[in-house]
């Protein structure tokens, strides 16, 4: 079967995946329009023609034909000036003004997929993906827009991006989206992931009404409060039914994502670079590549959307060799010691961790320069020998002797005013001349638009990584960008944020290729830059600085809505919790963190009782037996109320099921709650050691389980079912 079918006589392009069809057409005028995106159809006859009507106040570019207006056509990639008053995909300014008349020129079809220069993007071999490029051309300005489509048939995803190419004349890009998509109706619920610091990835649902629903970031990062992702769902969509269109932007900086309705009750979805703080100067014979948008569709609801997303990201987006490797159980010393540690204290903590069965020890902030608080030394990546007299190499050797790997925290994009680096290179910090610097967490951001700054980060981080047996890096970023520096020419000032991101991607590309055996975890005060652009380089992310088990229920649910469980860092922490003060049972803290994905601990084990340490050892033993199922199995969200949460994972071979239920608060005379599991082999017999019973798969999926009636706050159970 051809993944991309071209009906040349009608100039129709039919892109097909396992689940959906995506159809575009060239009209007789040369305009490229969108005809269909939805459940897969085998053939497209074009029997249902586009209807042309005379619409008042919708101008026509064709003299004498009042029925033809771009304002009501489902355009594939729109521009300004010819009568489409909806939000455009591309705005340019040059000596001819601001109008573009983009007409179809030609197409190219090939197996495989090209890399996007300087940008993270999906990938696949010639058997997995087929690509189409369509050139649109404006004759007056000599500008060519190339729309790039890559069809992943088995994974059921479509990748889209655009390239803007100048010819004889320069121009300035004032807005350039990666993709827009027109729908023939507006009957949608918009799903997005919102939040704030320590409360990331809240799954929100908003009915689409008259006007525009828009999210984005101008922080220089995708941010805690927004994620570059939107899903449009039919009003009846649930976990197991309904239409869901998902769109991801593979980018980590300023972005916009919107869906708007029109007077004709159609809608337009768009994603790309945020335009208020963006412009880009193109010289003659110059080009600009947009970030990539990933599109999917299912008629089977949000569970199928999630599982498709997990599969695609794991197979076609995460570049790291760790993508299919089990993530180690780690302990991070941050909430155990903060900045107040010595080598002796670290080794005491490591010894207890080793006895418990922990596999990786991560040394967090405070190991370098004169870093005894958050007011100094960022940028001075040299070991503090007062704290670590045997250096990183000596510490790593001692950790390795205990049977654990050694990991290290960095914040390479930042600089402290009180640092040797700032005293030597104050011009490397992002700040506006003539104005006081804007501090956040007593630090400034390094200017990654400068090659010498990127080179310094690469060299200084590499030097540390080569100095000891380091197996893991936690790459943090604890503030957003404020000032735009004066260093760029006036006509390039608004290129800064995108140039910064290109610099960061260059650094990450170099370091992750240079150190392929190191597991890189991203962090930005938790989930402040947890997006697909960063995940391309770093297969694991610290989901949130909030480690409270109850708070983590919604954070991890929202994160796992689109990101694979193997990428989600989740830790057991101390009580009272350091963020919210809540006291939860160790069992619940463990159960919730295990369901997050990449499991670990972040507390002072040396202060725990023998009973607590025995319980932690048992948690670790349990997690060893279920790690593959949780990190690489299928996730199913189950019955949820305002006071309860439940989910189960099913291993790829359906031989194991891990079920977790959490009740937040005890209620008087509470009714019994029954939960039905999902995804099991219906004919198989499963044994559950926690219950001492056996169950058939269809029994668990249709009758379900009655939850224990326990009068305790923050109660949870974990049941493991193994196929007999």
Where are the regions that the model predicts?
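Polysaccharide-binding surfaces and accessory modules of carbohydrate-active proteins
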Residues: 6, 10-14, 32-260, 276, ...
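Conserved, mostly hydrophobic/aromatic
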Residues: 19, 162, 285, 331, ...
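Active-site-proximal substrate-binding groove within the catalytic cores of carbohydrate-active enzymes
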Residues: 17-18, 37, 505-695, 709-710, ...
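Active-site-adjacent "subsite" loops/lids of carbohydrate-active enzymes
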Residues: 326-328, 335, 339, 412-463, ...
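Active-site groove signature of glycoside hydrolases
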Residues: 359-367, 458-489
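Aromatic- and glycine-enriched glycan-recognition loops and surfaces
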Residues: 337-423, 455-459, 499-509
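Glycine-rich, aromatic-flanked loop segments that form ligand/cofactor-binding clefts
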Residues: 71-74, 79-110, 116, 242-253, ...
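Short Pro-Gly-centered flexible turn/kink motifs
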Residues: 101-104, 280-299, 715-721
């Amino acid at each position: 079967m051809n993944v991309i079918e071209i009906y040349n006589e009608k100039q129709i392009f039919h892109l097909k995946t396992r689940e959906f069809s995506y159809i575009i057409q060239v009209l007789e005028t040369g305009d490229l329009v969108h005809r269909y995106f939805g459940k897969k159809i085998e053939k497209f006859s074009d029997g249902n023609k586009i209807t042309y009507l005379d619409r008042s106040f919708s101008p026509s570019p064709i003299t004498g034909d009042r029925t033809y207006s771009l304002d009501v056509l489902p355009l594939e990639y729109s521009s300004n000036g010819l009568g489409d008053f909806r939000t455009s995909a591309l705005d340019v300014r040059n000596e001819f003004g601001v109008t573009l008349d983009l007409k179809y020129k030609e197409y190219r079809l090939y197996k495989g997929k090209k890399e996007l220069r300087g940008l993270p993007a999906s990938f696949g071999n010639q058997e997995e993906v087929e690509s189409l490029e369509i050139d649109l051309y404006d004759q007056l300005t000599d500008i060519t827009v190339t729309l790039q489509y890559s069809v992943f048939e088995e994974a059921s995803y479509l990748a889209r991006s655009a390239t803007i190419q100048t010819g004889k004349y320069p121009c300035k890009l004032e807005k350039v989206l990666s993709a827009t998509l027109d729908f023939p109706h507006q009957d949608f619920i918009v799903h997005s992931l919102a939040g704030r610091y320590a409360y990331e990835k809240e799954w929100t649902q908003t009915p689409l009404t008259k006007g525009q629903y828009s999210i984005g970031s101008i922080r220089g990062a995708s941010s805690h409060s927004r994620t570059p992702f939107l899903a449009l769902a039919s009003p009846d969509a649930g976990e197991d039914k309904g239409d869901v269109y998902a769109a991801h932007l593979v980018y980590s900086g300023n972005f916009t994502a919107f869906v708007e309705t029109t007077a004709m009750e159609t809608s337009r979805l768009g994603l790309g670079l945020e335009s208020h703080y963006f412009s880009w100067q193109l010289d003659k014979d110059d080009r600009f590549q947009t970030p990539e948008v990933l599109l999917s569709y299912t008629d089977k609801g949000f569970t199928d959307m999630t599982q498709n997303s997990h599969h695609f990201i794991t197979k076609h987006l995460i570049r790291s060799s760790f993508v299919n490797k089990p993530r180690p159980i780690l302990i991070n010393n941050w909430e155990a010691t903060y900045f107040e540690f010595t080598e002796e204290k670290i080794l005491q903590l490591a010894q207890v961790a080793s006895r418990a069965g922990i596999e990786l020890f991560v040394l967090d902030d405070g190991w370098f320069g004169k870093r005894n608080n958050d007011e100094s030394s960022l940028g001075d990546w040299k070991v503090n020998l007062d704290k670590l007299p045997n250096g990183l190499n000596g510490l790593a050797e001692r950790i390795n002797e205990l049977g654990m790997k050694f990991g290290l925290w960095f914040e390479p994009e930042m600089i402290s005013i009180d640092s040797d680096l700032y005293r030597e290179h104050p011009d490397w910090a992002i700040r506006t001349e003539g104005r006081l610097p804007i501090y956040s967490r007593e630090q400034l951001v390094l200017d990654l638009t400068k090659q010498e700054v990127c080179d310094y980060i690469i060299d200084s981080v590499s030097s540390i990584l080569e100095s000891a047996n380091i197996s893991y890096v936690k790459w943090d970023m604890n503030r957003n960008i404020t000032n735009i520096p004066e260093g760029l020419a006036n006509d390039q000032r608004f290129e800064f944020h995108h140039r910064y991101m290109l610099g960061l991607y260059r650094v990450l590309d170099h370091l992750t290729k240079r150190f392929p055996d190191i597991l890189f975890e991203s962090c930005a005060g938790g989930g402040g830059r947890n997006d697909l652009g960063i995940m391309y380089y770093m297969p694991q992310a610290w989901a949130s600085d909030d480690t409270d088990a109850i708070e983590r229920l919604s954070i991890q649910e929202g994160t796992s809505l689109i990101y694979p469980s193997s990428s989600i860092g989740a830790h057991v922490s101390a009580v009272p919790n350091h963020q919210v003060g809540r006291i939860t049972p160790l069992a619940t803290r463990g159960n919730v963190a295990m369901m997050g994905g990449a499991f670990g601990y972040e507390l002072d084990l040396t202060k725990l009782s023998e009973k607590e340490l025995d319980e932690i050892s048992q948690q670790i033993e349990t997690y060893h037996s279920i790690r593959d199922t949780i990190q690489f199995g299928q996730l199913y969200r189950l019955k949820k109320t305002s006071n309860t949460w439940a989910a189960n994972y099913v291993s790829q071979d359906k031989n194991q099921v891990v079920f977790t239920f959490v009740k937040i608060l005890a209620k008087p005379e509470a009714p019994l709650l029954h939960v039905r599991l999902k995804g099991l082999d219906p004919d198989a017999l499963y044994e559950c050691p926690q219950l001492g019973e056996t169950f058939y798969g269809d029994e668990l999926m249709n009758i379900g389980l009655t939850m224990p009636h326990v009068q305790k706050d923050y109660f949870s159970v974990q049941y493991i079912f193994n196929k007999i």
